[in-house]
């Protein structure tokens, strides 16, 4: 392991964190704060990108090193978020919005896994 790769992972993380903030702000502006659509969006998009990344590595279109670390750990690690997803659901529970909470859990899990599967299989060799 080199310090250069750590720097690239950190750079990917910085870009991912900024992207997450921008997506969240855009979603609040467009849809309001009634449902955590920003968290859902970054989780689904990030899962799709992860599927594409792994397919690119599997097809040998990208070298696993450093791309899995820079994009997978750095960028996507900062873009997607389980802690915010968890807190969004705690807040929905506290508001008594159990239907919204259930929808949020189901949508995040189903859409994120589906997006990862689609991204991966979209680029895999037949």
Swiss-Prot record:
GO CC field: plasma membrane
Protein name: Fluoride-specific ion channel FluC
InterPro entries associated with the record: FluC
Organism: Vibrio cholerae serotype O1 (strain ATCC 39315 / El Tor Inaba N16961)
Transmembrane portions of the chain: 3-23, 37-57, 70-90, 104-124
Family: Belongs to the fluoride channel Fluc/FEX (TC 1.A.43) family.
Record-linked NCBIfam families: crcB, PRK14200.1
Pfam families per the UniProt record, alphabetical: CRCB
Subcellular location: Cell inner membrane
Gene: fluC
Free-text activity regulation comment from the record: Na(+) is not transported, but it plays an essential structural role and its presence is essential for fluoride channel function.
Keywords noted in UniProt: Cell inner membrane, Cell membrane, Ion channel, Ion transport, Membrane, Metal-binding, Sodium, Transmembrane, Transmembrane helix, Transport
